[in-house]
Amino acid sequence: MLVTGAGSGIGRATARICAEAGLRVAVWDLDYESLASLTDELTTGGATVVAAAVDILDEEAITAGFAATQEVFGHIEYLVNNAGPTNAAEVSFSHGITMAAGSTANVTSAWLALGRRDGDAVVNVASVAGNITGGGAEAWYPSAKAAIAGFTRYLALRRPGWIRANAVAPGLVDTPRMVAYMQDDEARSIIERNPMGRAGYPDDVGAAICFLLSPAASYINGVVLPVDGGAQVTV
């Protein structure tokens, strides 16, 4: 399997949980130190890991990254599109859309071009912000996440080969990126309104992603699964 944006947060949790389930994991990120520490963590646990610093806006880099992964793993059954801009507040609308939604489409297209088999699956990381008000998010963020949800449903409908395509839609998740971006008062307000009374953890989302990839979810297709502690029912 391949996880983009695997260096921290949801991507890192997904890679670890899926590795613990016995999957071979390829991890892409542009943060070399995070990639190195993740690789050490996973290999110490006995996992087979391929790590690469891949710019997911560069189609040639994407192709090279897949080639390097295939040399070790052969067929890549599962794809998790998680990468996005690291400094959300400083991103322009067009760049945010390209970085989040455009890169998801580019990586998925390159993955599909490698050839698919029955049972292959992709999970994209959307957001509840794409379904409900974006709150304090920059305009590009809910727009990009809504596009990712739509792209996921498109893939499920078209089903190139025999893939399944699903997405997760996290609410507020306690990741370094989110904590740095949101003001404390805003985060507290969201948490107070949540039926579960807390923010999500990366493992909450990672576990949902790994489930959607697994044979246990073999008849789940075209779903955008909220992983938000019930935040959507309060709107």
Question: Whereabouts are the PLM-identified features?
Answer:
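Conserved glycine-rich cofactor-binding loop
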Residues: G7-G9
